Curated annotation (Swiss-Prot):
Name of this chain's protein: Trigger factor
Compartment annotation: Cytoplasm
Keyword field: Cell cycle, Cell division, Chaperone, Cytoplasm, Isomerase, Rotamase
GO biological process, one term: cell division
Recorded GO CC terms: cytoplasm
Primary gene name: tig
Reaction it catalyzes: [protein]-peptidylproline (omega=180) = [protein]-peptidylproline (omega=0)
UniProt main location, coarse: cytoplasm
UniProt keyword annotation of Isomerase present: yes
Any single Pfam family the record assigns to this protein: Trigger_C
Function: Involved in protein export. Acts as a chaperone by maintaining the newly synthesized protein in an open conformation. Functions as a peptidyl-prolyl cis-trans isomerase.
């Protein structure tokens, strides 16, 4: 098919494609299209496939021309996109929109224009020489002591509290709860039984952890809370404290160390391991902190626009995930969906821009992964997870998982290269606990 094509770059990562199909090709297309119609046509008084062309065109001519135009546009776009440059290739999630409805006349050239989204065109002008401010954090003896206490708690003996006991911080509470309406009746579908959480450590459902403190075993209380995915609905929650357990901590000694792992013979062995693990966790968190800061700077220093279909597609994926988590129909709660999209948009756009820049830098820096680096990664994963190297290799034997592994290695190598071109400045002092908690929420 003979096509005349003109690609024009527009704002917001869009392209306009103008197409002209030669009259001869349009005629041949229309003739084949009509012949297929005639083979399938059924009209009263005529056998299938025996309807005269003049009768068919008189009765359905307008509809046939519309269908023929749609089929011709689809075929022309397929050929046009196949011949388009890399910068003019449409995004898979983008559906081209007609600039205006075309008129199909088999005796004339057929022309139409569509607008569609493309991968953002980004000119990376500034990718190095940045100053990164990093908090001053270190592992203290207090941090080590706190982690040893957590180990004691994980190895504690759990026992029931007495019948007259009250809920205290550190207790393990078991509760039943349900929502009630204005008349005090149970709201159907809100009943939950046997919910367990640690007071003072976990908030629990409806953030009931603080409310339960001081309640007696078997006591029932009604609390005013906030419900809904956006916490914008008032709710009355009736709670019954069904059980209370307490932890009896073991002594911090060699015996505890040996209970934790056969690798430890003394408390000193355990303490050294704790200190090393905290140091490694801090190192990883600091690296991640610098990586995120670097990506934010790269987005700021290299501005560009995202195609709307890319942003909406990402938000739709997040919405589907939220709906599955809450067990809600995807067709419901349109108002909540709009509110979530408004809240998510800045974060989604930032995330997508970072991904675009990373993909471009991977190509620009020609980052590759060698077979030796893959083997080293297998060893690292096996050591970190306590698995055998053979099991790790088996897990990544599939093409998809192996590709994901290689992409992870490539991105780490790129990050190391980019961070090496930056200057790190020491920021304000911060405790290890606060820093790690902030990074876990980032």
């Amino acid at each position: 098919m003979e096509l005349q094509k003109k690609f024009t770059a527009l704002a917001q990562s869009q392209v306009e494609l103008e197409v002209v199909v030669a009259r001869e090709d349009a005629q041949r297309h229309y003739q084949r299209f009509v012949e297929e119609y005639l083979e399938r046509a059924r009209l009263p008084g005529f056998r299938k496939g025996k309807v005269p062309l003049a009768v068919l065109e008189r009765k359905y001519g307008s509809a046939i021309r519309q269908d023929a135009a749609a089929a011709l546009m689809e075929k022309a776009l397929e050929e046009g996109f196949a011949q388009a440059s890399q910068d003019s290739q449409p995004l898979p999630i983008s559906r081209p929109s007609l600039k205006k409805k075309p008129v199909f006349d088999p005796d004339e050239d057929f022309s139409f224009a569509v607008i569609y989204d493309v991968f953002p065109s980004v000119e990376l002008r500034n990718t190095s020489g940045f100053s990164l401010s990093v908090p001053t954090v270190s592992v203290t003896e207090e941090d080590v002591s706190r982690e040893l206490t957590r180990i004691q708690e994980r190895n504690a003996l759990v026992t029931d509290k007495g019948a007259d006991s009250c809920a205290e911080v550190g207790d393990i509470a078991t509760v039943d709860y349900h929502e009630v309406d204005d008349s005090g009746a149970v709201r159907p579908g809100t009943e939950r039984a046997g919910v367990v959480f640690t007071l003072g450590v976990e908030e629990g459902p409806f953030a009931l952890g603080q409310d339960i403190l001081g309640m007696k075993l078997g006591q029932r209380c009604l609390f005013a809370k906030r419900a809904g995915m956006l916490k914008d609905e008032a709710a009355q929650v009736r709670v019954t404290l069904k059980a209370l357990k307490q932890r009896q901590l073991p002594s911090l000694d060699d015996e505890l160390a040996q209970d934790v792992s056969d690798a430890f013979r003394t408390l000193d062995d355990l303490t050294r391991s704790v200190r090393q693990n905290l140091a490694e966790a801090l190192e990883a968190a600091l690296h991640e902190y610098k990586r995120r800061q670097l990506l934010r700077i790269l987005v700021r220093e290299n501005p560009f626009s995202l195609p709307e279909s890319l942003v909406v597609g990402e938000m739709e994926s997040r919405w589907a995930l939220v709906m599955r988590q809450f067990g809600v129909s995807l067709s419901g709660t349109p108002q909540n969906k709009l509110q979530f999209f408004q809240q998510w948009r800045p974060e989604v756009e930032e995330h997508l821009k970072q991904r675009v820049i990373v993909e471009l830098l991977l190509k620009q820096e020609q980052v590759s992964v060698s077979a030796e680096e893959i083997e080293t990664e297998y060893v690292r994963i096996a050591s970190k997870t306590g698995s055998k190297e053979e099991r790790v290799r088996e897990y990544y034997a599939g093409e998809e998982k192996r590709r994901a592994l290689c992409e992870g290695i490539r991105e780490r190598k790129l990050c190391q290269k980019l961070l090496g071109r930056c200057v790190t400045e020491c920021g304000p002092e911060q405790s290890l606990t606060d820093f790690l908690q902030e990074q876990s929420r980032a």
